[in-house]
Amino acid sequence: MKDLIITNKILNWYDINKRSLPWRNKVSQEKKQYFTLVSEFMLQQTQVATVIPYFNRFIKNIPNIEKLSKYNDRKLTKLWEGLGYYSRVRNLKKTAQIIVKKFNKKIPRDFYELKSLPGIGDYTASAISAIAFNKPIIPLDGNIERVLKRYLYLKKQSQIKKEFLQDQKKIFGTSTKRSSDYAQALMELGALICKPTNPNCNKCPLSNNCKAFKNKNFDLVKFKKINKETYYKLNVYKKNNQYLLIKNNKFNFLKNLNIFPMDQLNNPKNFDKDLNFKISNMNMNIKIEYKKNHNFDKNINWINPAKLENYVLPTFTKKIIKFLESQK
């Protein structure tokens, strides 16, 4: 009964306050499943506000799973340009190809079949199962984790481990008839009300029983992430006012994308950096060196900095080009 009360409170709040998001539009069941697949890939490590224009452009150009499975790689990367984490879009296309070939163009409903697809782990499989197929599953994303931590007042390191939170989320119960809405409602509650800072408790449907609200302590215990310090020498080759870029087969980040030739250095002494970037869990310190002659014989491109919009380039590379141009 208590679970049902919580569920109804959250669903009632959601019906009134939910955001209008393009992947929530009323469409056929087949389109809803495709929209969910695409949006969940895009939302991995990326905020909703950032994803919306990319999603709209993506769906306009690639309206179904079959077209995605055959879409030109260069055009696909261009559609994704600026979202980062490009392995997501490569995995999304691989997933589409498997769905077309193995599952007769139908996104699989089974959780473990979903998990077998490239780029889909526990969370994404849970989200697709709940949202696209109305299964009574609560996908534990950052928003729902935050609601759970505050509602139960979880303050110990042992209490914020994934395994513990997965067990504790049962406090929210499930909705048999509206599982899709309920999963999204919990996410929405974390995104709009139980925000990382300055939660809007006065509008929260759970505040009466929330232990963080009762204790007036909304601080969140987090695992400390340590960014790895890395050092690189970036080599600049210039000819006819164009920069030489190479296809990256050397580093795990920005795989198969165009970057400047770079060498990683191990704990260099007296390293005088020109630039600093953060990619994933790396703090990249970069020293720029201008070179005259190169010995690259393939996978190179000469880029005109005045026409950057014409190229498929990661933001990382674009920022370096703009920096170099600003130093003239």
Model regions: which residues?
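Intrinsically disordered, low-complexity, charged terminal extensions of DNA damage-control enzymes
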Residues: 1-21, 25, 29, 188-328
